């Protein structure tokens, strides 16, 4: 009888462990950001214009209006997806055929892509849009490496 009770308790503990692992897996999947699902395609179109204006000095004559629109676009992206949205702004999205679509800051002779990327990575900061960005513990927003 005591043996059956131990088996029952052990089975319950194993079941709880399996449920905990399943819940953790579902939570981690929820934290992933999918373009077109968690945020729209090309969500930062105005931010592209703003980055070019600030870094390259080309574009609209009223950069503060463009900045406000960019910040609104970035604020509309869920905070846990902002790094991914900025990555898409800088690197675009590679299709299964290998084409790069959406976003993608271009390399220009008088305006290097790395300078554009460095500035784009600051859009969530207090000096620009003053937005939070949720990241995994110990992970910094590092968007300077070419994707």
Swiss-Prot record:
Record has Endoplasmic reticulum as a keyword: no
Tissues and organs where the protein is expressed, per its UniProt entry: Endosperm.
InterPro entries linked to this entry: Allergen/soft/tryp_amyl_inhib, Allergen/tryp_amyl_inhib_CS, Bifun_inhib/LTP/seed_sf, Bifunc_inhib/LTP/seed_store
Keyword Ligase in record: no
PTM summary: Five disulfide bonds, which are essential for the inhibitor activity, are probably present.
Primary localization: secreted
Signal peptide boundaries: 1-21
Gene Ontology MF term list: alpha-amylase inhibitor activity; serine-type endopeptidase inhibitor activity
GO cellular component, one term: extracellular region
Protein purpose: Alpha-amylase/trypsin inhibitor.
Name of the featured protein: Alpha-amylase/trypsin inhibitor
């Amino acid at each position: 009888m005591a043996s059956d009770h131990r088996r029952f308790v052990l089975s319950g503990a194993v079941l709880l462990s399996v449920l905990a692992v399943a819940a953790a897996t579902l939570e981690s999947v929820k934290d992933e950001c999918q373009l077109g699902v968690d945020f729209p395609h090309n969500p930062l179109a105005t931010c592209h214009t703003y980055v070019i204006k600030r870094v390259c000095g080309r574009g609209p004559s009223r950069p503060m209006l463009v900045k406000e629109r960019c910040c609104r676009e970035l604020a509309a992206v869920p905070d846990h997806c902002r790094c991914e949205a900025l990555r898409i702004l800088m690197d675009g999205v590679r299709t299964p055929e290998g084409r790069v679509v959406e976003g993608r800051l271009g390399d220009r002779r008088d305006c290097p892509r790395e300078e554009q990327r460095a500035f784009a990575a600051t859009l969530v900061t207090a000096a620009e849009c003053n937005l939070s960005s949720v990241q995994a513990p110990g992970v910094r927003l590092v968007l300077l490496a070419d994707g």
